[in-house]
Each structure stands twice: as C-alpha cells, then as structure tokens.
Amino acid sequence: ETHNIAACTVFRQGHVGRLASYPLMAARAGMIGMAWADSGRSPKGVAPFGGRAARLGTNPWAMAVPSDLDGPFCMDFATSAVAMGKIKLAEARGQEVPRGWIVDKDGELSTDPKAIAGGALLPLGGPGEGYKGTALAAMGEVFCGILTGLGFGVEPTGRHNDGCFLIAIKVDAFRPLLTFRRDVAEFAQYLKDTPPAKGSSGVLYPGEVEHIAERKRGAEGVEIEDATWKKLGALAAEGGIAERLGFA
C-alpha cells in the first residue's frame, strides 16, 4: 500500500496448500499478486528434460489480477506435466494416466500411475518440449530455494521445508484500478469470443474452469472416490469421531 510493490520469501514452511490463495488475496486488495513455491530440500518428483531421475519439485506458479469478471482472472499450475495429486488420484481410482505424464524407474514412458514409485513426473511440455517446464521449475528453485537461502537438492535427514517467493504490485501505481479492472474483463471476453476449434466448446479465460467447478461443487457437493472415502473413514474411526461425522 505504501511503496506500490512488495516482495518476500518464506522458507522452512510446511505444505503451502492452494498456492493461488495468496495471489487472490492481493487481487481482492486491488493488486497483482504472484506466488511461486518449491519442494525445499524434500525428495523430488520431477525429472529435468533429458533426464530420467527426479531432481526438481513440481514447483507451482500462481498469479491473479483484479477484474470485473464474475470469477477470478488467475492461474495456478505446476511446472511439471501434471500435479502429483492427479497421479495419486488416478491410482486411487484404478485409472491409467495419459502417456507423457510420467516415466518409470528405467526412464520409460508409462501410463501406470504406480510407476511413479521409483520413476518421475515429466516437466511441463512432456517428452517433446519439456525444456520449457524444466526452465520454469529451475527458476522456481532459484527464487524459492537459492534466494531464500534454503538451498537446493535433497537433505535426507531434514524435515519438510518448502520455500516460497511472493510479490504484490499495486495497480493504482500504474493505472486507475477501475479502468484496469474493466480492461481485464474486456480482454477476457475478447478471448472468449474466439471462434472455437473443431471439437471445442469454446475458449475459457484463465481461472474460469476452476470458477465453474467451484460453483458446481458448491451446489452439488464434492465428489470423493471410494478409496479416499475409506481412508477418511478409517482416520475418523481411529480418532473416535466416525459416528459424529457420519461414517459409522
């Protein structure tokens, strides 16, 4: 608010959770927000382009800007081909994953989510253009690991200690906020007015698909696969609260 731009680093933290939550806080305050996170000195899950062993984290990147849209104009994605959670979800559902997401312990492409054990996620761009995801993930390590003093690589005896880099930019320091918000909304509509490609239902602005899903789940509830539900039930029973939560 005072100096128009601010940045900070965080390290030796636990899991950051939903990374977009922090840029969205900035957007609601009339600022552009950005957040980057790495996996600290914890075990890695992503093989750099051209390699078969994990040396990078999924290192997500999130940004959000103020707008007059119904939903937030934002992005939040891993710099790997896919977030690790989607691999675990496919395994829990007994489903295969698309080819190009993971490699097994021998560096071979696999569609079996269980192959991630001893294998690795591929970087954003997959086997063909993964150098792009590798570059983004490596920059994430610099901002969240080296700039913070946390370091890089794996410390086997260390605790979970992720790093973060966050920045907020006051829009009013550059342009009137109301004008900026209007222009972002008009830009989003300009994108949505793009003639759809064959087989496409149309273009969505960044963050729109999550906004649609949030409204739907708010009205209809959140779908949870059986394997996860059983785990939750077991934890509730272990804690003596299964009946109170409706598991019994």
Task: Cite the ranges covered by each PLM segment.
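A glycine-rich, acidic short-motif signal
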Residues: 1-61, 65-71
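Short glycine-rich or small-residue beta-strand-to-loop segments that form or flank ligand, phosphate
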Residues: 6-11, 123-125, 166-172
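Conserved active-site and cofactor/substrate-binding residues in soluble primary-metabolism enzymes
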Residues: 17, 21, 58, 119, ...
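Glycine-rich phosphate/pyrophosphate-binding loops
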Residues: 31-45, 141-158
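Glycine-rich beta-alpha junction loops
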Residues: 40, 79-82, 171-173
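Phosphate/diphosphate-binding glycine-rich loops and adjacent basic-rich segments that engage nucleotide
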Residues: 44-114
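Secondary-shell segments that build the walls of catalytic and ion/ligand-binding clefts
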Residues: 92-154
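Catalytic-core signal marking the mid-to-C-terminal active-site face
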Residues: 142, 153-248
